[in-house]
C-alpha cells in the first residue's frame, strides 16, 4: 500500500501489484482508447478492466493497435475484462480477446425503474434498489440465464 495505507513510505516500485485508474476528460471510445493504450503499453501490465461499454470498447480499440490482450497470462497475454454487452464486447468475448464481461439485466432495470417511478408518483419514500450483474464468457453466452441479458 502507498499513501495513507500500511506503509506510507513505500513507493510504486515496492509494490507487488499496482492498480491504476484512468478516467478520460470525456467518455468517448477514442479517449478511453488513449487511456487504455497508456496502461496496456506499460511493462508488466497483467490485466485491464473496461468499466462500462464505452471504456470496454476503448480497451478493445487500444488492443487493435497493440495486440496484447488474450487468455494466456502465462504466455504474456494481458487479461481483459469488460462491462456491458454491446456487439463489440460480445464479439471480443466470443473470440477470446476478452476473457469475459459483466452484463446487467435490462428487463429488471426497466422493472425497477417503473417501480421507483410509481412509488415516487404515489409519494412513497424511495430506497436504493440493487440490480444483479452476470458474468459471461464464451462458455455461457447461450445459457438461459445469460442470453436474455446480452443486448446490443
Locate predicted features:
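Flexible loop/hinge segments that line or gate small-molecule binding clefts
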Residues: 86-94, 98-99, 139, 145-147
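Hydrophobic alpha-helical
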Residues: 24-91
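Alpha-helical scaffold segments in soluble metabolic enzymes
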Residues: 58, 92, 112, 116
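A generic structural signal for alpha->beta connector loops
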Residues: 14-17, 75-77, 98
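Hinge/beta->alpha junction and helix N-cap segments in small-molecule ligand-binding domains
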Residues: 1-34, 50-55, 81-86, 103-112, ...
